[in-house]
Amino acid sequence: MYDLTGKHVCYVADCGGIALETSKVLMTKNIAKLAILQSVENPPAIAQLQSIKHSTQIFFWTFDVTMAREEMKKYFDEVMVQMDYIDVLINGATLCDERNIDATINTNLTGMMNTVATVLPYMDRKMGGSGGLIVNVTSVIGLDPSPVFCAYSASKFGVIGFTRSLADPLYYTQNGVAVMAVCCGPTKVFVDRELTAFLAYGQTFADRLRRAPCQSTAVCGQNIVNAIERSENGQIWIADKGGLESVALHWYWHMADQFVNYMQSTDDEDQEFFLGQR
């Protein structure tokens, strides 16, 4: 059980409903500090969060997850001045726009990876950090394909691949930073917008989604926090239709098995090099 009491949480999000609802739940967990980085200012939402727990310090930055990593570094240098350290990083920025593939990939995948690459050195135990937890909020169509939202699905598949790769003991045993993902099912906020299919053949289905039964953002946010509290390194969760379940992961091609002779060190020098101790 991961105890959020006293933790310093950094949430990189868009201005959607899941981020706000997740933050509301986090504020009930006696966290010490909450940094919110999102694309749009929302003072009423910040005030609402603060009213839940007055003793929790909340900081806000207007943030574009698609910015260059060099610019991100400047932001997070400032974040660290206020936060001192980060225990939990939540990546929740998302975009579903099949007409704009670049923006979809940059927001959902490239931006998330750049954020992780920027924040990890602050958390890495071998670089003066205290370890911690990275939570990548993704989608159920990052587990199985979507014939309607092809670009969105591809970006979310990438999040799962990145999460599982970064959670490998090769890194975790060194930096002490666990990595997990929560795959959210559709919410009413998601389907209650103009959705465009990747190809015109799928548009009828995209239009019908508006009438589909979906979970509320409040329930989804609660289950994201539930997943965090039950987290283990490398774990993938599904938060859909009001429920939460762990994904049974399967290896089809495991690098350590396929390249067993390469992956096993032959002497101490190779061991130090492979484990990233140089």
Curated annotation (Swiss-Prot):
GO terms for molecular function: oxidoreductase activity. It comes from the Eukaryota. The active site is at residue 152. One of its GO terms (cellular component) is cytoplasm. Keywords: Oxidoreductase. NAD(+) binds at residues 11-34. Changing residue 200 to E: In strain: Persimi42 and Persimi50. Substrate binds at residue 139. Belongs to the short-chain dehydrogenases/reductases (SDR) family. This is Alcohol dehydrogenase-related 31 kDa protein. The gene is Adhr.
